[in-house]
């Protein structure tokens, strides 16, 4: 009666069916692929996050949001909150994405509550979340659309919506 998989809606409005391995499977219990303090495991991301945490956050947020908000929008909002609060309130915004990432991939709330991780170790948390997406097959630097298209290779996509009458 209902399809076995629910397509993810992309920013362009094209539905993409989840593909095993890339998109999460509900109910699977998993562990984080790296620890919170393993920042130097990916030195490029470590440096990017140290100098421009808004970019790391924006890339992660675009994937977690399934492309509903762009990297640029999320990064700009993060930077604005950081600037207005003097870097004191970004954790309150960014920890919500850690919670969503954990829910999507069945990850434990470890090593402590999401808000504490972001309050005490914001840069380490952003690096861990980015590394987690990479470990699960995403390429955050390329954005949601690319990742969704790559996952849909060989998978039937929904036909485009009717454009109506036109010349």
Swiss-Prot record:
Family: Belongs to the cornifelin family.
InterPro entries in UniProt: PLAC_motif_containing
Subcellular location per the Swiss-Prot or TrEMBL entry: Membrane
Keyword rRNA processing carried by entry: no
Lineage of producing organism: Eukaryota, Viridiplantae, Streptophyta, Embryophyta, Tracheophyta
Organism, as annotated: Zea mays
Tissue specificity of this protein: Expressed only in pollen.
One Pfam entry name: PLAC8
Segments traversing the membrane: 67-84
Any Gene Ontology CC annotation: membrane
Coiled coil: none
Residues of the signal peptide: none
Keywords: Membrane, Transmembrane, Transmembrane helix
The protein, known as: Cell number regulator 3
Highest taxon, organism lineage: Eukaryota
Principal localisation: membrane
């Amino acid at each position: 009666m209902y399809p076995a998989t629910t397509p993810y809606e992309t920013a362009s409005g094209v539905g993409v069916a989840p593909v095993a391995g890339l998109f999460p499977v509900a109910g699977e219990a998993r562990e984080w692929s790296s620890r919170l303090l393993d920042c130097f495991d990916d030195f490029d991301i470590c440096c990017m996050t140290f100098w421009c945490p808004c970019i790391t956050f924006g890339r992660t947020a675009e994937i977690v949001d399934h492309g509903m908000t762009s990297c640029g929008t999320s990064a700009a909002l993060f930077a604005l909150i950081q600037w207005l609060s003097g870097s004191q309130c970004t954790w309150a915004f960014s920890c919500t994405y850690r919670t969503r990432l954990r829910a999507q991939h069945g990850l434990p709330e470890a090593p402590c509550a999401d808000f504490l991780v972001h309050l005490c170790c914001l840069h380490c948390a952003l690096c861990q979340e980015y590394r987690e997406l990479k470990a699960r097959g995403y390429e955050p630097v390329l954005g949601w659309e690319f990742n969704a298209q790559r996952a849909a290779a060989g998978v039937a996509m929904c036909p485009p919506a009717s454009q109506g009458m036109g010349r």
